[in-house]
Regions:
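A detector of single, family-specific signature residues
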Residues: 1-298
Length: 298
């Protein structure tokens, strides 16, 4: 082919080839209303995934900043990522601020945010720890802490709004996926959105391949590896959803719990055992979704 041929317009040839394929291929299906809903669901679930990931990163930043400004705080409460602690740190972003504040003000802040769970005794503990704290007084870090907490609050509001929209779409779906113990609306929606119509796949193994959960094959000459690793080439979103939801199913469904325990007893690493349970879950989901039946605990 000469170089001038590379710039030749062949749109009409492509259009003719596409039209002929659409006319002659009987296996092709029209774009249905259900497909539209699943695409809309996919956009929402992936957006929710990105917001949850960002929230996790921001919470890590808060933990880092608290370690710099008020390291003793994490020893006084089970978790610093709660409303009462956020409320205190937004107004008093550092040990030096907590140490110099009036006890009544501090008590009011944490009592209101915790709905009475934390009171004067906890306020005294916070202030005493702040007065002997080794935390640094860095105004720039304190400002960053306040802004990061505000970011987390905004992201959480966005997540709630997205989850409400996902719930609306799931109410319109004819699915039995949430009948499985451990699969809630959000994770069920995530799986449905990534897989789409289960009937598009000839077998559950095709779904596993689509998720990148099929074992890879290594071959050199006549030697074929018997220690195949997972491919991890498919949809990372579907793989993430399946792995995470499998952990919940193994907690709430006795059959899967026993299966996970069996794999662990065989000496398999926890993550490897979860991957085996995830494959079993996919086969089960394929069966109930294609047959339109509810899951029944054995």
């Amino acid at each position: 082919m000469c170089s001038s041929d590379l710039k030749t317009k062949i749109d009409w040839i492509d259009s003719r080839a596409i039209a002929l394929m659409l006319l002659t291929d009987s296996s092709l299906k029209p774009y249905s209303v259900s497909s539209y809903h699943r695409e809309n669901l996919k956009s929402l679930t992936r957006y929710r995934f990105s917001r949850v990931q960002k929230r996790s990163r921001q919470k890590s930043s808060i933990s880092r900043l608290v370690t710099i400004l008020f390291p003793e705080l994490s020893q006084l409460v089970p978790c610093i990522h709660i409303s009462s602690i956020y409320a205190m740190l937004e107004e008093l972003p550092g040990a030096s601020y907590v140490a110099s504040t009036h006890l009544t003000r501090l008590t009011n802040i944490i009592s209101k945010a915790s709905r009475g769970r934390f009171g004067r005794e906890m306020a005294i503990a916070f202030r005493e720890a702040a007065r002997t704290s080794i935390g640094a007084k860095i105004p720039a870090k304190s400002l960053e802490l306040r802004h990061t907490i505000a970011d987390v609050r905004a992201i959480e509001s966005e997540i709630r709004e997205v989850e409400a929209e996902i719930q609306k779409l799931m109410d319109e779906e004819t699915t039995t996926i949430t009948s499985v113990p451990g699969i809630g609306t959000q994770m069920g929606a995530f799986i449905l959105a990534e897989i789409g119509d289960f009937s598009r796949f000839d077998s559950p193994d095709k779904i596993l391949a689509f998720a990148g959960m099929s074992p890879s094959t290594y071959q050199s000459g006549k030697m074929i590896s018997s220690y195949a690793h997972m491919e991890k080439r498919g949809s990372r979103y579907l793989r993430f959803a399946l792995f995470n939801v499998t952990k919940y199913v193994c907690n709430y469904e006795p059959g899967f719990s026993a299966y996970l325990a069996k794999k662990r007893a065989e000496g398999k690493h926890y993550n490897v055992a979860i991957s085996h349970a995830a494959k079993r879950l996919v086969r089960m989901l394929y069966a109930i979704e294609t047959n339109g039946t509810l899951y029944e605990v054995a």
